[in-house]
């Protein structure tokens, strides 16, 4: 008989339940975690042995949403879930980032975490539930893991922090921040904010970390009751003698190599040193393992760079700890794009474009939480040439999706509302060179390109990546880190914002012991760097251009009586299709009668407006119109009087005398004046030619189209 073991606790305004022992008993561990009807089933499987020759930790995290969780059937052709959506990919990364640093450095066994959303309450985002589940299964599994971790979402409403706000509450919140960490340290932060101060952001991180302690306590209690035995795994002992020999041969040479400021030249020199040392040691003793020598070389290399920083010496490229690399900022460099910018910071460079489209260009997103439309898109591309490599070129990888989302978070707070600027906007960042923080270069480039496109953003935004080197109580925070400093350091801390505050904060920490003091230093140092970059950007362009590009569609707005919408659309869309073909414009109609006309030519837009005014104009009884015969029948003729309206001239209303045959007086396409005699309740129009041709009749009002 299956007997589940359950922990239930209050987490802010929600009740969380963690259950194990009922399902997936062949997995290493499995839990069902629920928070107010949002339930995520999380499993972990770990291989007992590492693959021979394995050189990295093969951790895989898959987060997947099932449409049955929301009581729906997939809308795809095959009626089943397909490749991961962008949201699923981002949540997979969100889970991966805080758990990866908690595995031992030398643990190389394959581990796979799968989180499946099986029930969803639209008010509760499953990502926090999935994070709690991943922490619980790894803690229960016995796999070497220095957890558990907790996770929390923090909102900021009416100047108060809110723990795990609902979907509706988030709409009113100036902050959407996710924080994860162990009992003693924050490990990961992901956030977007509506221009909050550094103090408010830091307060949110600390608040979330304090509140999530209840999660850690309950997971520990569950492990005590249902946890599996710890694996009998021991790290391979360090070969101290070999380590000393490698350090003796390589340390000084690597120190010299890391004084080379140009990245590719430095890499070439470092690779040559490693090859020389490996060859020399193998020549002395062919029983040595080349892979082990390479691992020790990597350790020596890391120590060389870190110790220099901690001693206060210049960094790899000769900078002091708070110096920003040289900046080059240019706008309007691509003649036919709607907006463009080239942002260069040292050896990191982004070519960024902004394209304006209409509402029909917006992205329709069908998520588990419901359907929504996104009119601001930001895409990030990282081709292999940007780091001097060859490789596959194709659909975006997880990293590109994640970096694009971070850059979008950085810009989102300053974007105009749809009523202020009724365009769909797509920003694309092409990374043409990379040596540290290309995502923050994308934020800077996006701000510049949007201004160049004439998008009325509220303020310029810039981003900067901070790093950390920490040994014991000694630490140094680095501004504008290089790729090597990111790889060899203890923290990747990215901040984007305007002169007035922070718009996005992302933090990934590889060690425990990051204190509030360190985060405060990093935020303050990042603010200084951000303001410096903004100053340089403002020299290139300080405010959005006064007009959009001549190649961008211009949107003209007009309002009609909602009851006339059917007239503009026509039967089966016939009228609006004819209008767009005739005028060469794009026409969009909203339910309240608002019509948006997009055109690259102002005359075409004016023509479309005039035609819509004709179609929606009220027909006045007693007024004479210029008409055109469109159909002839035995009992009269149908005459178009403009604006897509047509009326009947009865045979008795054609002439003052008796008419035996309509075609004796009228022909198809003939222009005739007609007087409106009546418009009945069904909108049918009765016309008269003879009343319009009396001597005292007024002149026709307008020619028929």
Swiss-Prot record:
Q: What class of enzyme is it?
A: transferase
List cofactor names only: Mg(2+)
Under the heading PROSITE patterns, the entry gives: KH_TYPE_1 (PS50084), S1 (PS50126)
Quote one Gene Ontology molecular function term.
Answer: magnesium ion binding
Q: Where in the cell is it found?
A: Cytoplasm
Its domain of life reads Bacteria
Q: Give the enzyme's EC designation.
A: 2.7.7.8
Q: Which keywords does this Swiss-Prot/TrEMBL entry list? A: Cytoplasm, Magnesium, Metal-binding, Nucleotidyltransferase, RNA-binding, Transferase
Domain KH, which positions? 553-612
Question: In the UniProt record, which is one GO cellular component term?
Answer: cytosol
Q: Which reaction does it catalyse?
A: RNA(n+1) + phosphate = RNA(n) + a ribonucleoside 5'-diphosphate
Q: Where is the S1 motif domain?
A: 622-690
List the Pfam families.
KH_1, PNPase, RNase_PH, RNase_PH_C, S1
Q: Record's CDD domains?
A: KH-I_PNPase, RNase_PH_PNPase_1, RNase_PH_PNPase_2, S1_PNPase
One of the GO biological process terms = RNA processing
The residues that the entry says bind Mg(2+) are 486, 492
The record describes its quaternary structure and partners as: Component of the RNA degradosome, which is a multiprotein complex involved in RNA processing and mRNA degradation.
What is the documented function of this protein?
A: Involved in mRNA degradation. Catalyzes the phosphorolysis of single-stranded polyribonucleotides processively in the 3'- to 5'-direction.
Q: Which family does it belong to?
A: Belongs to the polyribonucleotide nucleotidyltransferase family.
NCBIfam families per record: polynuc_phos, PRK11824.1
**PANTHER family assigned to the protein according to its UniProt record, in alphabetical order:** POLYRIBONUCLEOTIDE NUCLEOTIDYLTRANSFERASE, POLYRIBONUCLEOTIDE NUCLEOTIDYLTRANSFERASE 1, MITOCHONDRIAL
Protein name per UniProt: Polyribonucleotide nucleotidyltransferase
Native source species: Yersinia pestis bv. Antiqua (strain Nepal516)
């Amino acid at each position: 008989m299956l007997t589940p073991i359950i922990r239930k606790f209050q987490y802010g305004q929600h009740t969380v339940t963690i259950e194990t022992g009922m399902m997936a008993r062949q997995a290493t561990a499995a839990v069902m975690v629920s928070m107010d009807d949002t339930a995520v089933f999380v499993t972990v499987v770990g291989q007992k042995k590492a693959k021979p020759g394995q050189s990295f930790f093969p951790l895989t995290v898959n987060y997947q949403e099932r449409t049955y969780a929301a009581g729906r059937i997939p809308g795809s052709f095959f009626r089943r879930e397909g490749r991961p959506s962008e949201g699923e990919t981002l949540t997979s990364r969100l889970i991966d980032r805080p758990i990866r640093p908690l595995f031992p450095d030398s643990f190389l066994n394959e581990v796979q975490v799968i989180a499946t959303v099986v029930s969803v309450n639209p008010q509760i985002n499953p990502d926090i539930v999935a994070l709690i589940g991943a922490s619980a299964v790894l803690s229960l599994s016995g796999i070497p893991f220095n957890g558990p971790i907790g996770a929390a979402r923090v909102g900021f409403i009416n100047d108060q922090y809110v723990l795990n706000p609902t979907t509706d509450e988030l709409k009113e919140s100036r902050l959407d921040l996710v924080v994860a960490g162990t009992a003693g340290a924050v490990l990961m932060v992901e956030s977007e904010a509506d221009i909050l101060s550094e103090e408010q952001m830091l307060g949110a991180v600390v608040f979330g970390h304090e509140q999530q302690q209840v999660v850690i306590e309950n997971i520990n209690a569950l492990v005590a009751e249902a946890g599996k035995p710890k694996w009998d795994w021991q790290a391979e002992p360090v070969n101290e003698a070999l380590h000393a020999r490698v350090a003796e041969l390589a340390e000084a040479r690597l120190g010299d190599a890391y004084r080379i400021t140009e990245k590719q030249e430095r890499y070439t020199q470092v690779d040559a040193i490693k090859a020389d040392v490996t060859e020399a040691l193998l020549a002395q003793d062919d029983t040595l393992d080349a892979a082990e020598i390479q691992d020790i070389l990597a350790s020596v290399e890391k120590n060389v760079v870190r110790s220099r920083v901690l001693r206060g010496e210049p960094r790899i490229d000769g900078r002091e700890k708070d110096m920003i690399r040289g900046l080059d900022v240019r706008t309007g460099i691509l003649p036919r794009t709607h907006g463009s910018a080239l942002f260069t910071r040292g050896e990191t460079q982004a070519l960024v474009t902004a394209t304006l489209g209409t509402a029909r260009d917006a992205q329709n997103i069908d998520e588990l939480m419901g359907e929504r439309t996104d009119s601001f898109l930001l895409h990030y591309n990282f081709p292999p040439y940007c780091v001097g490599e060859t490789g596959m070129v194709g659909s975006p990888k997880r990293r590109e999706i994640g970096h694009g989302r971070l850059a979008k978070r950085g810009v989102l707070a300053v974007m105009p509302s749809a009523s202020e600027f009724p365009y769909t906007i797509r920003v694309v960042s092409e990374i043409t060179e990379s040596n540290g923080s290309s995502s923050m270069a994308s934020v800077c480039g996006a701000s510049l390109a949007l201004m160049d496109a004439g998008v009325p953003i509220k303020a310029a935004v810039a981003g900067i990546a901070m790093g950390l080197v920490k040994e014991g109580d000694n630490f140094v925070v680095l501004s504008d880190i290089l790729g090597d400093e990111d790889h060899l350091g203890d923290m990747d801390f990215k901040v984007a914002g305007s002169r007035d505050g922070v718009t996005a904060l992302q933090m990934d920490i590889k060690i425990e012991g990051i204190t509030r003091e360190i985060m405060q230093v990093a935020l303050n140092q990042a603010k200084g760097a951000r303001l410096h970059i903004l100053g340089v950007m403002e020299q290139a362009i300080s405010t959005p251009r006064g007009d959009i590009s001549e190649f961008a569609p211009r949107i003209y707005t007009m309002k009609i009586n909602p009851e006339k919408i059917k007239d503009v659309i026509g039967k089966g869309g016939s009228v609006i299709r004819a209008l767009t073909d005739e005028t060469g414009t794009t026409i969009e109609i909203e339910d309240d009668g608002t019509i948006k006309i997009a055109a690259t030519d102002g005359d075409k837009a004016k023509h479309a407006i005039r035609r819509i005014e004709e179609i929606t104009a009220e027909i006045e009884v007693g007024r004479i119109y210029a008409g055109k015969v469109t159909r002839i029948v035995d009992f009269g003729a149908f005459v178009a009087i403009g604006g897509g309206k047509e009326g009947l001239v009865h045979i008795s209303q054609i002439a003052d005398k008796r008419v035996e045959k309509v075609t004796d007086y009228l022909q198809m396409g003939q222009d005739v004046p007609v007087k409106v005699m009546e418009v009945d309740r069904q909108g049918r129009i009765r016309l008269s030619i003879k009343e319009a041709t009396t001597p005292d009749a007024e002149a026709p009002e307008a020619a028929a189209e």
